Amino acid sequence: MARYKPNQQNHTDPKQQVVLPTYKLDSNLVLLPGIIYNVTFSRFKAATLLSRFKSQVSNVSLITNLLNEYDFDSKQEEKDDVESKYMPPPISSDAVTGIKQFYQYEQQFKGKNDDSSKVEAEPQSEFDWLVLAINPNLEKIKEPQTSSDDEYENIVTIARVIGMVDDTSNIKLTLQALTRGIKHNKVKPTQTNEVLIDIDWNSNIDDVASKYDVLNSKVLKLFRSIDGFIVDYRQALTVAASLAKKGKQSKDLKQKGDLLTLNPLANSLYLHLAASKDFTKAYISLQKLFGTFNSSSNTKIDNKTFLRLIDLTCAIIPFPNHEKLKLLNKFNSIDRINEVNRMLESMIQVFYNLKKNNKIINHWFYNEATNIQRANVVASQLKSIRLILEGMTNKPDKDIKTNQSPPRQLVRRGNNNKPAKSPMSDDGNESNDEYDDDEDDDDDEDELKAITSFIKGKLPNISTLSSDTKRLIVKDFKRIKSSPPGNSDFHVIRNYLEIVADIPWDRYVTRFKSNKDIDLEFAKKQLDSDHYGLQHVKTRLIQYLVVLKLLGINAEKEFEKIESENSKKSKKNESSSGSMGKNDKQRSEKTFTRSDDSIVIANNDETSIAHETARNKNKKSKSLTTIEKSSLNKSLMVSKNNKSPIIMLVGPPGTGKTSLAKSIAKSLGRNFQRVSLGGIKDESEIRGHRRTYVGAMPGVIIQSLRKSRSMNPVILLDEIDKIIGGNNGVNKFNGDPSAALLEVLDPEQNTSFIDHYLGFPVDLSQVMFICTANEASNLSRPLLDRLEMIEVGAYDYDEKLVIGERYLLPRQIKRNGIPNADLIDVDKSVMQKVILDYTREAGVRNFERSLGRICRFKAVEYSQSLEKLSEYQPKVEIEDLPKYLGLPFANLSTELFESPIESAKCGVVNGLSYNSDGSGSVLVFESIGFNHEGKSGSSSLNMTGRLGDVLMESAKIGLTFIKSIIYKNLLNLSDRNLSENLIDKINNMEIHLHVPSGSIQKDGPSAGITVALSFLSLILEKPVPLDVAMTGEITLRGLVLPIGGIKEKILGAHLNGIKRVIVPRENRKDLIEEYCRSTNDFNQLNDLLLDNENKYNFKRCEPEKFWFDKYGITIHYAREFWDVIKAVWGDALLVKVEQARMVEYHL
């Protein structure tokens, strides 16, 4: 039905007719073209409006999340009759065509495309589709001179939604008024809430310059009147304040005060003109706009700009709404010009009369009136103010007739002074609603309307609240209805009930319609697209989804079985009760379907639609059969048995733990809430404050439910190891917040979590909690026992390379304003150079910062190329990195393999460390010895390099073990005298052990074999190859014990050029697990572990081959220190050790 009309000579004829969706505002706002308005809607009304464009805005996440809160996709027959009657359907194909053609003509009208062949065929963005024909609410726009509303019933404003803000309670839509239109009521479209509209694109005006001069003179005169009024009003306020401060009066009239501040018209104008920042900003912009055309003789105004100035002037200047409606109704441009000139003259006259009358009353009050007359004037003003205030805060009861009560009787809403109500309802039946109020609850100004609606409409149907809890909430509601607003308990209980009503009871948001419809392939693709690697985390989530899917399938089969059994029982009961009378049968059915413990409170919402909907729901609830009730109970039982997992992601910073939680919520289609626990030291932050305290609020868990608008969100408890309390064993004055988390994170207890503020149990079993931590050792043992720990290890540089190419670089290109991804070319060699030489971390946070710096430099180069200052090169070369990122880190591998001149190579051994940031590195242990000639028994050991107590104890153990094997002559030395000389050498040697990087604290037991080998190398004067690194704890008997961080240490060894690594034999199972995880093949894990049980000779070497192929490192295992000596120097020194083993074996 949308079509173009050719241009015609008659200016009043429109140029376009289209079918557009319509909407009627609830307020008295009049939208004038050219202005952007921020309009606040309730969440439901905004969702109802935007649901009509659901297929066009499906990619806007903010709108999609809002629509997911309401079930707009259910079948029409499943809804209540009244509810479906007022539920607008999606826009029709005629409206879609109309929006497309409106968009095309809008582009041509704005002059974006002079060639009609280049006009875009349809809107380019999602918000371009949100075009509406806004009907003014004529019922709320009243004109002092009574006139018929038929004159304005066909006028509409064509507006587009260009923005949206969600403040968790309301939705604020930004509407851009585009042009005016007239409805064609004779031609009815195929769908309701749509209409054929004549669009006003006319901008033909004869002699626009002279008409602008007339408008400009009037506007400038009005500007002077407004500025003068604001100056006078502010001067009156200043004089009054100074006189009140001095406490005396002046004889000068200007210093005696000004009665302008007592004038209601002056107060209203000043509040509109000066008290609003938005008006001040718009008013200044309007002045500048007129000044632009007045100051420059070269700037000539065109027809479009002139007509836009008319609408802008009328919209910004504080004209009444009925005057704005008149201007909106002027379709003819000449009529519009005459109307705005008349309005300007009227407004100028208002300011002139105000100034003139104020001058007269000031002269009479201060110069002619007596003291009694002045007192009477002030008393009359105060009396008028009191009557107005009483009229604003009180309202007479609608049920009391005017002839039955004094005209001056004031009745407060919601008190106990309401008239007695008959115990019989209108239809003659007994009323069971003991909480039913009068019609004052229907008033839009009733501050308890939302609470009343919740108590009467939603509370009885909440399945997760017990009857005792509902009874306590209703009891508090009765208390607030019977107490005056001035009572202190009134505000406390009102805030409490508002928070209770704001919790999204029984609302579950998910991507899938039911559990049995869960799409596992979609979830896998979503997780893989958001994160690279982390297969063990993804596997755990997929397992959870599989469990949900199977439970949904089993529940559906169980429901069918229950229905078949109950249908057989009902048939038997019907056959056996055939002789029962009709009245008795009806009476028995009524008592059978009615539940004794149910609380049924009639809905008393603000509209008649809500009344009818509530009655239909009550009828439905009364007609529930036992089969339906058993199905609902069974569904609830299955949901209760399905506990959401409580996962803790442990790993170094920057490894994607927080973003992984967001990806989990996205794949499940649930709302996501992040709660930062770092630094929390008060137990009330978790469990809430008790209502008796001033400013009491619920805890972060309940607040997260309110923000997410659902009872099954994904809540991320970020940095749970940074919470104050936990494993330090210190009693806190404000309680232990980590202990408060025990109930929240226990699946057996969080079904009845009690927040101190609410005071009743809340079911958290459907909430998916994900915790993140850097160090699990900082958590208390009871809390750690409740969490399912998943370790997120450090990334190797291959994984960082893929992450940088797929995720980090495209994101930084977009964030830094690069219009096209092809404008920055970073190949693998450059990215690998950045990873190895400019970042040393377990995660990718600094890596992303480095890529961001490169993008910013390239953005500067690109902007200079646009100004033709230089030529732009997209490719980033390795030689450019020092210019972009500065100097690289020092290469430790050169320090390892290049020894200083004349330095002793003996006593230098490479160890492996696990750093605090989650990465691995190589530590060089240096030992130097001095012999004291002539002094026997003067050996000593000095250790430097900020070594911790555990590391120094390991060094002492290693030195004692080396002394013991030399004293026992267990090493195969060539000369006996050499062995005796070694004993004397040890007894008289002063050993100094140093670990470089002295500013870094070092501690831990994993350097035991490294230190022991360093001492042995020093004593035997036998150097250790520099391409060997080792890690492991040593005992006094020479056993090598397992340690942690094997993967990170091997990666650090590889980055520093190490070719051979010695690790404890017991750590081989960790390498096997990492091998299966990296290859994503856990089928052979059991076989590899069985083969690993042979401690001396395992047969399967796939893990070792994997590490060699990936990093070029040969792995050696050590059960005893002798295995370390064998891996470093061979079997030559161990002949006596093998002989001693054979003797011990025969014995």
UniProtKB/Swiss-Prot annotation:
EC number: 3.4.21.53
GO function term, MF aspect, one: ATP binding
UniProt domain Lon N-terminal: residue ranges: 20-348
Top-level division of the source organism's lineage: Eukaryota
Gene3D superfamilies found in the cross-reference section: 1.10.8.60, 3.30.230.10, P-loop containing nucleotide triphosphate hydrolases
Gene Ontology cellular-component annotations: peroxisomal matrix
Full protein name: Lon protease homolog 2, peroxisomal
Species annotation: Debaryomyces hansenii (strain ATCC 36239 / CBS 767 / BCRC 21394 / JCM 1990 / NBRC 0083 / IGC 2968)
Lineage: Eukaryota, Fungi, Dikarya, Ascomycota, Saccharomycotina
